[in-house]
Amino acid sequence: MAKLLVKQVRSKINCPLDQKRGLEALGLRKMGQVVEHDSNPTILGMINKVKHLVSVEEAK
């Protein structure tokens, strides 16, 4: 299973509550924070919901 690096690049201020909770579920609390996750349907769905707030790269 591929690993993904997810980085928060935009602020969650003025975002709907479900998007804020999506960022928290991904483990992102601050701008510029990077977390690593497995690429599975659950994580991909969370990333899709906040795709305008994060950048995603495949881990090496």
Swiss-Prot record:
Any single Gene Ontology cellular-component annotation: cytosolic large ribosomal subunit
One Gene Ontology term from the biological process aspect of the record: translation
InterPro entries with a match to the protein in the record: Ribo_uL30_ferredoxin-like_sf, Ribosomal_uL30_bac-type, Ribosomal_uL30_ferredoxin-like
CDD domains membership: Ribosomal_L30 (cd01658)
GO MF term set: structural constituent of ribosome
UniProt keyword annotations, A-Z: Ribonucleoprotein, Ribosomal protein
Family annotation (HAMAP family): Ribosomal_uL30_B
Subunit structure: Part of the 50S ribosomal subunit.
Recorded family membership: Belongs to the universal ribosomal protein uL30 family.
Full protein name: Large ribosomal subunit protein uL30
